[in-house]
Amino acid sequence: MFGEIINGVPFLGYMFFDSKVGIRPSAEEKLEDSIEELFRLRKKQTISPQVFIWRLNLRITGCILDSKKYGWLFYYSQLTDLSILFHLDWFVGHLFSRYGFDRPKDIKRFIRSYHEITKNISRSSYIINADRYSFEEKAEILSEIYNQRNFNKNDARTVDSLFKATMFKEVQRLEYDIQNFS
């Protein structure tokens, strides 16, 4: 029994050790693959720089939509071995170098996101909280990030409907990162 605890006991994507809670290596690898896929898509110019930054930040912070929390870090917010978060921050920086991109200043960090989620979620402006976006901010995200131009920016119902549909597609991508962890 003690040998198992020293080596870690896997459960629901976590690894439980004697004094720490970590993440199963397969869960980390899946997130790293997902992040690297964003870099590949950007390198092939399949996605715009704006979509790339938005999706990368969503992968890092997760988001709140319709009062529900989505994303890898929200799921793994009970971890106590923070070394994985420092590694993931390093990994993102490494990918910028490897793919020959300059790192924009507005790229989020895993370690800060974790602390915002665990200690400041109700007041955080760092975590993407779609529920707090104004009508104007939603319209700007649709037009500036997603390049959607053919909608009435003055119609709150249209903007809200398009924004929710767009965000739910992004949420599906986030949820894929935490599926099949057993």
Segments and roles (model prediction):
Residues 1-8, 113:
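Short proline/glycine- and acidic-rich turn/helix-capping motifs at secondary-structure junctions
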